[in-house]
Amino acid sequence: MGMKVPGKGESGPSALLTPPMSSSSRGPGAGARRRRTRCRRCRACVRTECGDCHFCRDMKKFGGPGRMKQSCLLRQCTAPVLPHTAVCLLCGEAGKEDTVEGEEEKFGLSLMECTICNEIVHPGCLKMGKAEGVINAEIPNCWECPRCTQEGRTSKDSGEGPGRRRADNGEEGASLGSGWKLTEEPPLPPPPPRRKGPLPAGPPPEDVPGPPKRKEREAGNEPPTPRKKVKGGRERHLKKVGGDACLLRGSDPGGPGLLPPRVLNPSQAFSSCHPGLPPENWEKPKPPLASAEGPAVPSPSPQREKLERFKRMCQLLERVPDTSSSSSDSDSDSDSSGTSLSEDEAPGEARNGRRPARGSSGEKENRGGRRAVRPGSGGPLLSWPLGPAPPPRPPQLERHVVRPPPRSPEPDTLPLAAGSDHPLPRAAWLRVFQHLGPRELCICMRVCRTWSRWCYDKRLWPRMDLSRRKSLTPPMLSGVVRRQPRALDLSWTGVSKKQLMWLLNRLQGLQELVLSGCSWLSVSALGSAPLPALRLLDLRWIEDVKDSQLRELLLPPPDTKPGQTESRGRLQGVAELRLAGLELTDASLRLLLRHAPQLSALDLSHCAHVGDPSVHLLTAPTSPLRETLVHLNLAGCHRLTDHCLPLFRRCPRLRRLDLRSCRQLSPEACARLAAAGPPGPFRCPEEKLLLKDS
């Protein structure tokens, strides 16, 4: 149940993994430790997979090997919740915030998980004296417990923190959300109002050393938020803080008096920013000047004055400009210089009406990756290393499926339970399996692993029939590819264009493809899939197929390789083409004669636009089909008349001619053609059906 804050190598809160359970964390309910679950309400949880990220391309449903076992990048939950089995480590009970009404009572009875020690407790069960805790408002039931805060323990990457998370669109960005600070000390009186006069005298902000600041953690841009009080066994006060900084008690909520939440006292804060400098050389900022416009403020106590000095020191440290800020930030700063001159300039420079240069020597970086800054006039030159650079973005993967490594060779013998091998070799078993049907082969695949591998042999699956299935699942497509059939029937199925393209690119030995009854949207995948071994193509009764669609299918691919002089069409090697029920015209037949010259069987039945001129095109002296046609089906073509029957005598190899259901053809004319058909007479087993024995 424990949770770790995402580090530098993780993408967001969805990557929160369960840490290994230590002996110190054992307690009531500590054995049921699980990772956080989806909230099922955010934008990432309710959307579907994108199909483009490297996790989606690895999934089996998208044609990948399925080895990563990760969800889509765009479906990573942005606010994962604790599992329903989570219980308090101290009392062993689950969250009971639904049993009370008040906000304070709800907080005391809700489960909170620490991002440092991973312990899940009720805040009301903690018996801590004066302690502080920071609540993360981004992730539900997440905080830094008072115990870890009191001991000074920090997470692995406090600079990035749990607030850095990936947005709903899948891009990683800096979250501008804020957390809650929990303290049990009595509240301080409200601070004096913000002065509109010049800032207190002191060294310029850009001449004072300080750690580099990321522009996405500029907490000064957030509006001040009032405190919230929580009443329980002891009085607690929650103060809104932004990102990685907490508001100093007694400081101005509207001002930029922010300091890192792990700083314990001013000496530690200044010494961490000035390594190697003795305390007597630390330059302390001067007290603020009184403003003529502001109201009179009573003299603060010594402790309050010390806090004010500490606040102003941290303010100056935080305002050291970041050299990695973009030019757009500098432009926006220059545009708003008229309104923020008294806030962003040092007192001396504000009076002179000028701003320090951006490229001054106080901001330049040395070649060693260290920044040199003079804290004051005549002071020593200080330097410290820059902060760690953000991790580089992962390289964009190529948009193709990564195929799994080649499988190990299949065993030649069948191992038995006794340890010996079966006397029959693999070749003998395959001869036995060839007499079984698809259903019996599937039963044999469940017997043992060896038989399962043997039954995938493509010689056992010459033809696969998936017709009349509403949807094709990824396991079905993977099974087809593993068996490598020579004939595949997908008629009247809901196969999509993406699925068909995925199949055809992996079935290079496919000889027969049946797509009758499918939509043109899916059949259009034939225009981009190479089928060198295809001999039969069935496109009967496909919806919305006209001359333009057939032209797209018949024309040669536009991406011919350089140096290739011959432009072959996609159906150059097809011997049997079935186009029944399509709206074909004579223009489509001309394309067919040009780009499918090896047709021996052609089905044009129930094509409403086929008539006598179409038969003249098929049997013309320039037609390549005149010498190759063996089977011709023109049943249901109502525009055919008796005048086209003598044209069929031009086809010497014609063995079957189907003219059934042609209304304008007389049975007598068909009988005369059957009696005088070259090179021998036809026989008529049915009316208007002419057959010739080979």
Curated annotation (Swiss-Prot):
UniProt domain F-box: residue ranges: 418-464
Zinc finger (PHD-type): 85-151
Listed GO MF terms: histone demethylase activity; transcription coregulator activity; ubiquitin-like ligase-substrate adaptor activity; unmethylated CpG binding; zinc ion binding
UniProt feature, compositional bias: Basic and acidic residues: 153-169
Residues binding Zn(2+) 1: 39, 42, 45, 77
Function in brief: Substrate-recognition component of the SCF (SKP1-CUL1-F-box protein)-type E3 ubiquitin ligase complex that plays a role in different processes including cell migration, cell proliferation or cytoskeletal reorganization. Mediates RHOA ubiquitination and degradation in a ERK2-dependent manner. Induces RAC1 and RAC3 degradation by the proteasome system and thereby regulates TGFB1-induced E-cadherin down-regulation and cell migration. Also mediates ubiquitination and degradation of IL-33-induced receptor IL1RL1 and subsequently blocks IL-33-mediated apoptosis.
PTM annotation, UniProt: Acetylated by CREBBP; leading to ubiquitination and subsequent proteasomal degradation. Ubiquitinated; leading to proteasomal degradation.
One GO process term, biological-process aspect: proteasome-mediated ubiquitin-dependent protein catabolic process
UniProt entry tagged with the keyword Amino-acid biosynthesis: no
Chain segments carrying region Disordered: 1-32, 150-420
Primary gene name: FBXL19
Main subcellular location of this protein, as a coarse class: cytoplasm
Taxonomic placement: Eukaryota, Metazoa, Chordata, Craniata, Vertebrata
The organism's place on the tree of life at top rank: Eukaryota
Domain notes: The CXXC zinc finger mediates binding to DNA containing unmethylated cytidine-phosphate-guanosine (CpG) dinucleotides.
Recorded GO CC terms: cytoplasm; cytosol; nucleus; SCF ubiquitin ligase complex
Entry protein name: F-box/LRR-repeat protein 19
Biased composition (Pro residues): 200-211
Residues the record lists as binding Zn(2+) 2: 50, 53, 56, 72
